[in-house]
Structure formats: C-alpha cells, structure tokens
Amino acid sequence: MAPETPAAAPGQSPVQGHDSPVQGYDPRTGTPAGAPLPAAPAAEVDRAVAAATAAFSGWRAADRAAALDAVADLLDAHTAELAALADRETALGEGRLTGEVARTTGQLRLFAGVLRDGGYRDTVIEHAGQARPDLRRINRPIGPVAVFAASNFPFAFSVAGGDTASALAAGCPVIVKAHEGHPHTSLRTAELVKQALAGAGAPEGVFGLVFGFEAGVRLVRAPGIAGVGFTGSTRGGLALAKLCAERPDPIPFYGELGSVNPVFVLPGAVAERGAELAAGYAGSLTLGSGQFCTNPGLIFVPEDEAFLGEIAEAVAGTVGAPMLAERIHSGLVAGLADLAAVPGVRLLAEGKPGEGPWAPTPAVYAVAAQDFEANAEKLREEHFGPVGLVVTYRPDEAGGPAGLVERGSVGEGHLTSTIQLASEDEADLAAARELLPGLERIAGRIVFNGWPTGVAVTHAQHHGGPFPATTAPAHTSVGAAAIRRWLVPVVYQDAPAGLLPEPLAG
C-alpha cells in the first residue's frame, strides 16, 4: 500500500477514497451534502493520463489564451449556481464564495494576458560569433500535470484554480484530483471547464478530473505525468513528494504546506494605534474560521498589559464559524489541548462559540518570550483554525524580535512575515531594519503595516517560502510567475531556421 497520500489541504482525509465513494458534508450540520460520487477506478485514471499525453502537442499560445478566457466567461455566467453549491459543501458563505469565483476567473484571465504578452517564454537569442555557435533559448511546457485540489478554497485553489490555470497556460494538460470536501462543486466546475475548453477548440483530453485516494496515488505514479501541484498539509505534501521522488523518473513536486506566518508588532505601533492593531489582528485571525494558509498564527508583541487587554477584548468580540470538515475541527481541538499544556502558556481570551458541530470557539493564548524559546518547536506548530499565540517580548532583552529570528526560534520557513511599526518612529525603523535580514531568509512575502491573510493575484506576487512552508521556495503558486513551475528551458544550437519554434525564428 502506498504511503499516506494526501490530503490536498488540511481536512482531506488520508484514508477516505480507498475505492470507496466520495461523500461531501454540510459543515453547518455534519450531515451528508448530496449523493456520494464514485472514486475513479484504475482504468479511468489510466485513460485520463493517456488522453492528456495525447493532447500534449501543438496547442498554440493564442489558442490557449482564448480557451482560458472562455473558461472564465462560462464560470462567471454560472457564479450564483457555483456559489450556492459550494456553500452547501463548505459553509463558507455565498458572499465569500461569489467573490472567490471572481478571483478564480480573474486568475484565468491574468494567465491569458501572460500568454498574449509572451514574456513567459524568456526567449534569448545569441547569434553566432567568433568561436561561438548560434544559441537560442526558450521555455517549453514540461508535459501533463497532476493537480491536487485544496479544501479551503473550493474555486481559487481547486478544480479551476491557480495550479490548473497556470499549467494550462504553459501548455500542459491537467488532471485534477478532486478534494473530497466539495465533490459536487468540483464535478460541476469540471463540467463547465470541459464545456468551455471544447467550445474554444482545445485538444480533447487537455483537462480531466478524478476522485479518490487510490486515484491520486495512481495519478502521481503514472509515467505520463510530468509534474504535481499541491496545496495542503505538511503530512500529505511530504507523502506526495515521496511518491514523486521514488518514481523511476522522478518529477517535480510543487507543494504549499504549512505556515504560521509570524507577525512582529513594534512598540511605536502599539503606542500609535494599539486598539486598531488588536482589532485587525482578531479579524485576520478569525477570517474564514481561521482556515487560511496565511493566517497570522504567531504574533510577537511588546510586554504591555494594556495592549494585551485590547487584544483580549477584540478576540472576545469574535464568533466561531463552522470548519470545513469534522477532521479539521477535531484536529484543532486536540492541538489546543497540547498547546494549553505547554509550560508558561495561558489562555488570553476566547470569542463566542459558533453554531453547529464543527464550529470552534476562537481563542488566543499568550506566553512570555523566554518560555516560548524554551518550547519553540512545539509552540510554532500550525493550528489550522481561528487560534493564535501571542508571544510577549522585552525590546531591550536578548536582541528583541530580531534576536528571536536569528536564534531560529521563529522557525525556518513561512509563506509570510509581517512587521507592524510606526513609520515615523526612529526606534521602530531601527528595529525593523534589524528584523529584515532574518525575515528575508524565512519568508516569501514580508508585509508592512497590514495583515497577511489576503494574497493578491498579480504579476509581482510571490506566494511561497522556505520549507516547511513550501517544497520549492523559488516558485509561487499565486500570480503570473506561477506559470514558471510548468516550463523548462530548451536551447537550440545552430538550428536551421525552418526547425526553430516561431518565437526564436527572428
């Protein structure tokens, strides 16, 4: 039996799908949502891979751009239907989900624009010179890609999400392993994607969808698959990475795993806007029931009882909301019991309980910096949910926040890190300068005077970070640069003009 595979995100069961039907649930009630869907048998996975392999040739960039636009247009036209369906399976709210469909279609159109711009090819032409051949380099697609959908974003990181959009843009056929947390949403989204692609004249087999644990294992092991994209838990990601590495022909694995996204609040910021910071923190921490990979799970604040009181007051005003799955909820409850048992840790504040069997109570715990460092490995574990740990420090002791980073207490890899400072305060500016070199080593995005939860889909975005945040810190899963994961450079040396790819023929 294969190693435990994946969960495409926290909440995906490592055992559901062993040739058993995939059943979604309503997180508000814990009852089944829709009929179970059959897991894909081996023959179905093999057919999907064979079709994807056959489709991998000659899909022009202009046609890919038109196809991505067509998918975006059709998903937009079905926004209300999709949001209602996803709300039944995720309880994330139709308003949030409507916005997420728009984010997803915006992503698709962004990559259509990337294709029309052409810069993703990274073409370089060096004409022959004295004792030097004619060399022409261009990026080419790697081949069919397997995408493991995530639980917490049923559109933007799922069937038609960023991994799928960027791979299709690169010219790579995609087979999505659906997340069992929203099976009917996945199925309907896939139907619309296939309809739009067919209408745009895309090659048959360029997109596929499979359900089930065993299907995911077989997909990763399939000889025709050239790369894997994943968003989810560290445990699930490492299991998949192992499968990729153990193939006779190892393939790249791009995994976004766990992150606690440390926030550093400097003294001047507390003096300038303490209540505002407390409210912003509570809002970011509990957004979406804390089920964001960019959730600010670890916050370092000056030793200041008044500010701790403002944080406690802000958190006390929050209300719990259903989590995506029973397993996520029970995992959070168990993790918090472990957290509360660590020496020096105390409960600072709790919000109001949410409604439903999977709705946790938002909570914030506190610990002094010296106790945190004594148990850092345990205390920087990710707790996926509306829960945070406040670490109080003395700015003039042990190097302050920068000392915590330099000693490795904050951890080695995060998607984000945040500095809250008073921009006109010289002491804060000096402390921030001391922090920056360390944060540049451990985080892919550094936020100033904001909160890390939102991740803009832009050309400049980098959503990645050193392990264990991701398995490939040089790459991003959000933004235009995400296409680079699915490309490989090829150099043509002294090639006859008639054999060169069109962009190199000039």
Describe these PLM feature segments.
Residues 152, 181, 214-215, 225, ...:
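Short, glycine-/Ser/Thr-/acidic-enriched flexible segments
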Residues 53-56, 60, 72-79, 83-86, ...:
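Structural signal for hydrophobic packing residues in well-ordered secondary-structure cores
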Residues 120-277, 282-283, 300:
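Rossmann-like NAD(P) dinucleotide-binding subdomain of oxidoreductase/dehydrogenase enzymes
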Residues 63, 67, 172-185, 206, ...:
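Short loop-to-beta-strand entry elements in the cores of soluble alpha/beta enzymes
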Residues 1-133:
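N-terminal Rossmann-like NAD(P)+-binding subdomain of aldehyde/semialdehyde dehydrogenases
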Residues 355-360, 410-500:
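C-terminal core of ALDH-fold dehydrogenases
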Residues 5, 279, 301-415:
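NAD(P)-dependent aldehyde/semialdehyde dehydrogenase
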